Regions:
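Short, amphipathic alpha-helical "recognition" segments used to contact nucleic acids or chromatin
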Residues: 1-6
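Short, basic interhelical loop/turn and adjoining N-cap
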Residues: 7-27
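A structural signal for short, well-ordered beta-strand segments and their strand-loop junctions
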Residues: 11-12, 60, 118, 138-141
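Short, well-ordered alpha-helical segments in soluble proteins
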Residues: 15, 26-37, 153-160
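Secondary-structure boundary/capping positions in well-ordered alpha/beta enzyme cores
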Residues: 18, 110-113, 135-136
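RNase H-like nuclease fold core
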Residues: 23-128
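Conserved beta-strand -> loop -> alpha-helix junction used to position metal-binding or nucleic-acid-contacting
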Residues: 120, 129-160
Length: 160
């Protein structure tokens, strides 16, 4: 039970309790959620979260839509290969200045250890990488290059 997250509802049968009430009580009193939400970290948590301990020499940055059309910029450690501790930062939106502000919460010594960052062709992503990771080499994502090449071949094929 210690290794895997469980819901309060799954405890109903074992302990003869109201699972929904238990979850509410846990959130309000036991978890420290209210204190965290009022802390310096919790104040900006709805806009961005940064995990400096997950940073590594090889990062990737991309935007994605998680829910309801909201775009997020996500910076991941490539060496973690999508497993635990792979997210370095997640920022609501793709505006360069907002993402740069969030990434600058990571100490510059850690950011300067990044040697390579993979990104797409977006100009805002280039600006983010240039400002937040000045010593990192920027590598264009293979998917975007393949798409450009296929589009060019398609144009030539149609023209002839």
């Amino acid at each position: 039970m210690d290794r895997y997250p469980i819901t309060g509802r799954s405890l109903e049968w074992f302990f003869d309790i109201d699972g929904d009430l238990f979850e509410r009580q846990y959130k309000r009193h036991l978890s420290g959620y209210r204190q965290w939400k009022g802390s310096s970290e919790g104040l900006h948590a709805e806009r961005w979260r940064v995990f400096p301990h997950n940073i590594g020499p090889h990062l990737s940055i991309d935007e994605t839509s998680l829910s309801r059309g909201e775009l997020y910029t996500i910076v991941t450690n490539k060496e973690a290969r999508g497993r635990k501790n792979s997210i370095v930062a997640i920022v609501l939106g793709t505006e360069a200045d907002t993402v740069i502000h969030a990434l600058r919460q990571i100490k510059s010594g850690l950011r300067n250890k990044v040697t390579e960052i993979t990104l797409d062709l977006s100009e805002s992503m280039h600006k983010i990488c240039r400002m937040a990771f000045p010593r990192a080499s920027r590598v264009i994502d293979r998917f975007h290059l393949q798409r450009l090449a296929l589009d060019a071949v398609q144009e030539i094929r149609i023209a002839h």
